[in-house]
């Protein structure tokens, strides 16, 4: 943690920032402890004040790259050159469970030094440590108030805070430390609408160098540059994500047009080859008949036939090579298009009639052990009918996730009643897609569904869901968020059990943009009841909701 928040005070005091600053990454590679290569040959540079996004599929190594840049972990090879120590806003906070807020922010020692000095027992070390930051407590209070966590104090344990509150603690660190380079790993994952708005405002007004890993397209569209990361390198697009997407889509459209043209050319070449072969066969047949009538010497006839066969063989070989080249090019185009297009999944439709009452919530309250009662002053009352598409909104801590668990039956209300239609088939997705058993292998999970489908059919389905043969023996615990989502939908198809209602709690939090597009398209085409919590407005727009429920 000390290394994590090792700031050079003369770089960060009073928000003063030198104009000459850059970040250079050269030939960076990283391998897992088992020697499997995650990425290699990553090189790029970022100039002072640039605001950029790093995008790429789940599991490509974006978060690992940020950790290397921040100095948290070392690369297998390559180098990082940075004019200032970067400030990192992490995606996960487990490493801070046993620390206080002040320790996590790297200000606890300064607070203690200031207290000792004010108490009249300060040492030379205390004055050195404080470094003339006499206003450190005021800066902390102002920063916490700005990010709407004024009730948080530096001596509180990080483990006592929610995910959104932890994110806001690190965002408050921006106002406390005034770093010149900021690294953000999925900063909006746990933020409610108000928190996201504050972050967007910071991105808009700051002159700092910002490097963001995110699937929040609103945030990505605020950045002026996009770096596309792959296992073999980094590709730079001097544009926002929206413009990048338009560029990529145009390239895919050009590939589709090229594919269609290539298919026509291939068909034309195959027809020509077929006609040429027919012509040669007819010519050879006529030659044999004519030779027989004219009693051509047997040896002369043999020479003619040999010359004809050699000529035909050469022609056939040239045509075959041309056709093989065209087939190869066609397959390469198809592959590149397949990698760039959204996978289509149809999970079927509910058979329930529209407007059938499915759930009735009456005067419900809920209390977690040791915490205040949710909805104490305004108990929840609501009805859910079949065919409704409901977007559940609310600030952090308002009880959205709790309500979803109450509706599914995972939790029981402390007060009040919840009635459900019977039978009611509910599919519940939490943020981690916990319906996927992490101890099973990818293939073993489908096999455990106890269906009558043969092995080859299960493996064909896995291939369709972008799980090739090398992934079948992987433990599900090692899958990325997007892979877990696709496997959950694949499992749903295997069970052949279309849900009456799909309930999802921030289902896009841990998946990449391509997986978000797949999920949005799947839910958009689903004809049934939806109850979803999401702060991603683009995802909500893509899915399409008819009712907004705010708690």
Where do the model's predicted regions map?
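Conserved D-loop/post-Walker B switch-helix segment of ABC ATPase nucleotide-binding domains
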Residues: 192-201, 509-521, 538
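ABC-family P-loop ATPase nucleotide-binding domains
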Residues: 95-160, 430-491, 495-500
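Coupling and communication elements adjacent to P-loop NTPase active sites across diverse families
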Residues: 19-31, 110-167, 247-370
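Pre-Walker A (P-loop) beta-loop-beta motif of ABC nucleotide-binding domains
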Residues: 42-53, 207-208, 379-391, 528
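GG-anchored amphipathic helix commonly corresponding to the ABC/SMC/Rad50 NBD signature/C-loop
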Residues: 164-183, 483-503
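ABC ATPase nucleotide-binding domain signature region
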Residues: 51, 64-125, 228-231, 386-395, ...
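Catalytic Walker B motif of ABC-type/P-loop ATPase nucleotide-binding domains
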Residues: 182-186, 191, 429, 501-506
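Conserved beta-strand
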Residues: 25-28, 37-47, 78, 361-365, ...
């Amino acid at each position: 943690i000390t290394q994590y928040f090792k700031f050079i005070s003369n770089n960060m005091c009073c928000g003063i920032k030198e104009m000459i600053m850059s970040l250079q990454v050269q030939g960076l590679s990283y391998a897992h402890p088992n020697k499997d290569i995650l990425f290699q040959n990553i090189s790029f540079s970022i100039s002072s004040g640039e605001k950029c996004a790093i995008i790429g599929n789940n599991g490509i190594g974006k978060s690992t790259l940020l950790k290397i840049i921040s100095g948290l972990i070392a690369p297998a090879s390559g180098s990082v050159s940075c004019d200032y120590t970067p400030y990192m806003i992490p995606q996960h906070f487990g490493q801070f469970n046993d620390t206080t807020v002040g320790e996590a922010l790297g200000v606890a020692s300064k607070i203690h030094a200031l207290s000792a000095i004010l108490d009249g027992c300060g040492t030379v070390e205390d004055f050195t440590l404080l470094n003339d930051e006499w206003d450190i407590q005021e800066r902390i209070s102002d920063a916490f108030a700005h990010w709407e966590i004024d009730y948080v104090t530096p001596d509180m344990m990080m483990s006592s805070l929610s995910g959104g509150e932890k994110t806001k603690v690190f965002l408050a660190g921006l106002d406390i430390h005034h770093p010149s380079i900021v690294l953000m790993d999925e900063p909006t994952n746990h933020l409610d609408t108000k928190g996201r708005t504050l972050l967007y405002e910071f991105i808009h007004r700051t002159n700092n160098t910002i490097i963001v890993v995110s699937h929040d397209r609103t945030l990505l569209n605020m950045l002026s540059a996009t770096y596309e990361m792959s296992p073999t390198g980094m590709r730079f697009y001097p544009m926002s994500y929206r413009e990048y997407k338009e560029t990529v889509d145009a390239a895919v459209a050009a590939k589709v047009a090229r594919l269609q043209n290539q298919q026509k050319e291939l068909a034309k070449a195959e027809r020509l080859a077929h006609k040429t072969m027919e012509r040669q066969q007819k010519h050879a047949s006529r030659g044999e008949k004519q030779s027989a009538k004219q009693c051509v010497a047997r040896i002369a006839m043999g020479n003619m036939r040999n010359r004809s066969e050699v000529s035909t063989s050469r022609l056939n070989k040239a045509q075959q090579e041309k056709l093989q080249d065209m087939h190869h090019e066609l397959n390469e185009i198809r592959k590149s298009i397949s990698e760039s297009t959204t996978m289509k999944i149809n999970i079927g439709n509910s058979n329930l009639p529209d407007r059938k009452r499915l759930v009735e919530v009456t005067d419900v309250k809920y209390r977690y052990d040791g915490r205040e009662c949710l909805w104490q002053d305004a108990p929840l009352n609501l009805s859910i009918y079949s065919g409704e598409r409901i977007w559940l909104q609310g600030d952090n801590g308002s009880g959205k996730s709790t309500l979803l668990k109450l509706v599914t039956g995972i939790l029981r209300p402390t007060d009040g009643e919840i009635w459900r239609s019977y039978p009611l088939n509910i599919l519940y997705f939490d943020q981690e897609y916990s319906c996927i058993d992490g101890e099973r292998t990818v293939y073993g999970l489908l096999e455990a569904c106890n269906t009558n489908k043969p092995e080859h059919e299960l493996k064909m389905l896995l291939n369709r869901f972008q799980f090739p043969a090398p992934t079948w023996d992987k433990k599900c615990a090692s899958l990325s968020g997007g892979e877990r989502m696709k496997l959950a939908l694949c499992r749903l198809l295997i069970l052949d059990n279309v849900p009456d209602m799909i309930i999802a709690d921030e289902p896009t939090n841990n998946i990449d943009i391509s997986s978000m597009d797949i999920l949005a398209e799947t839910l958009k085409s689903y004809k049934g009841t939806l109850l979803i919590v999401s702060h991603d407005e683009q995802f909500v727009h893509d899915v399409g909701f008819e009712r907004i429920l705010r708690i």
